[in-house]
Amino acid sequence: MGPTRKPNVCSRLSRRALGCFSRDAGVVQRTNLGILRALVCQESTKFKNVWTTHSRSPIAYERGRIYFDNYRRCVSSVASEPRKLYEMPKCSKSEKIEDALLWECPVGDILPNSSDYKSSLIALTAHNWLLRISATTGKILEKIYLAPYCKFRYLSWDTPQEVIAVKSAQNRGSAVARQAGIQQHVLLYLAVFRVLPFSLVGILEINKKIFGNVTDATLSHGILIVMYSSGLVRLYSFQTIAEQFMQQKLDLGCACRWGGTTGTVGEAPFGIPCNIKITDMPPLLFEVSSLENAFQIGGHPWHYIVTPNKKKQKGVFHICALKDNSLAKNGIQEMDCCSLESDWIYFHPDASGRIIHVGPNQVKVLKLTEIENNSSQHQISEDFVILANRENHKNENVLTVTASGRVVKKSFNLLDDDPEQETFKIVDYEDELDLLSVVAVTQIDAEGKAHLDFHCNEYGTLLKSIPLVESWDVTYSHEVYFDRDLVLHIEQKPNRVFSCYVYQMICDTGEEEETINRSC
């Protein structure tokens, strides 16, 4: 069944002016986003490269803000030219921000300070300080000293916008200790906080004496995920671990005596002691073996995706039920392609329970449904497929004339990700406009040209195609963001040169304007 006809923009605006909406929360917002989606996808709308900038340090983007110099300078991406929001004072290398997350105010919560109702940047510095910075002014609102006994390096959401996990670098031990044969049992530490107001859950150590020869660990949605070099992945409940093995409840800003030393929790030089030390193997929730520890959970009901733990199985994905490990019908997904870069698969971020499988020349959106007359088993089927625009031939014939004049014909196979054919590089989802964005690249002569396509998330129909004016080198690292009426392309070139290209939605008047090239 095809898409139904929807009201045009004028009709939507008229209904909005008259207040013709139900009383459901969010109806006006959804209507506004529907109007914006119609404007984005209409034929006369263009996306123009309004400004470009270059930097010697990494460039990051988050919700309309572009960050330079390790998050020290923030520029608005909304204006038609670079508009600086703030610039923090210069700092030493040890004080630079290494990782950051954007926190946005929850709806309906009563917060202690008026500044808490505005967005904040939660930042981790090189010298183990956790900062909460105003996203509009750059002012430091809160600061917590983590610990002197390890180097914290990574920030991630355990529960989005509610709980953060701060992960340390892996403890390799000193060269002297390794030469002396002294084994380092603690692999890494995980510090867990609830945000706004900041409160400490605890710091957990990952100890090889308990978990064995573990190679990595992380925290996601309250689950401790432990990985091994053999490909084994094990899942544990973090809440159960905290309740069972927490040595002492610690509160930020309160006095604490630990190991014969007294100090204030979260202040230098005392920091936060490691107060969750596992002394016995916690209850195991789930384990599975997968190539390169690749493991994902999603779908309705819960399913997981793994690759069988054999190198020759790379590119083969098994979709299984979490409750009993049973393979879904048609649950072995393998894309028929020959390419240098492997295809990838993941659960659709729109919470529909669907699965996106991306190869060099096609994007498959798969759906998980119950088998008729057997509600306990599920099957995988295609919802829709997006195909690259390329000529339908895999074999090329080359004619060679020998010295004697004999014509020799040789046949060879083209790779599916051959740069001279249109190849998919990035697939993302714009949740507010409900659009799939797909970056496709083709090598033309010496340079690559890319375009960003918007597809209907429900049916896969192509709604809009935006050419990117800058050349695209497939050997460089690229990120492309589509955020409402903005497209942003960040490119990392050799010798740590970063470029940022900003495109904004405009109404096509037929007049060409000069693109602004700025150094931010």
UniProtKB/Swiss-Prot annotation:
UniProt subcellular location: Membrane; Nucleus, Nucleolus
Transmembrane segments: 186-206, 222-242
Pathway this chain belongs to: Protein modification; protein ubiquitination
InterPro entries: DCAF17
UniProt keyword Glycoprotein present: no
GO BP terms: acrosome assembly; cell morphogenesis; protein ubiquitination
Keyword field: Deafness, Diabetes mellitus, Hypotrichosis, Intellectual disability, Membrane, Nucleus, Transmembrane, Transmembrane helix, Ubl conjugation pathway
Gene Ontology cellular component terms for the protein in this record: Cul4-RING E3 ubiquitin ligase complex; cytosol; membrane; nucleolus; nucleoplasm
Expressed in which tissues: Ubiquitously expressed.
Membrane topology: Multi-pass membrane protein
Main localisation: membrane
Disease per record: Woodhouse-Sakati syndrome: A rare autosomal recessive disorder characterized by hypogonadism, alopecia, diabetes mellitus, intellectual disability, and extrapyramidal syndrome.
Function text: May function as a substrate receptor for CUL4-DDB1 E3 ubiquitin-protein ligase complex.
Quaternary structure (record): Interacts with DDB1, CUL4A and CUL4B.
Protein name: DDB1- and CUL4-associated factor 17
